[in-house]
Amino acid sequence: MQIITELSKTIKERLKADPKKSYVALLHDKGLNKILEKISEESTEVILAAKDTVEPKNDKEHVTEEIADLWFHCMVLLTHLDIEPEDVLKILENRFGEGGLVEKAKRTSPK
């Protein structure tokens, strides 16, 4: 997962750039709502692209590209919120190996 570390570092560096010259700086400058709007947009694009993976199109490359876009914007969000990607990876690592329903029950508190 070296790419995650490298991407995180690059995003942090670009936050300091001129928003007129850096897409990351522009998103950061426009604030949380703009970043969330982009994540929503990218999520929708993933859903639509995934529908294209079924016959007859079978376009897996498109959905893969859209997922990369979504991950990128999630990385921008993490940086904006001052959350390290490693924190997310640790949570995933802790969940690995447990059945999904068992793991979910552990983190779902009754109301």
Which residues does each PLM region occupy?
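Flexible "arm" and connector segments at domain edges
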Residues: 1-67, 71-111
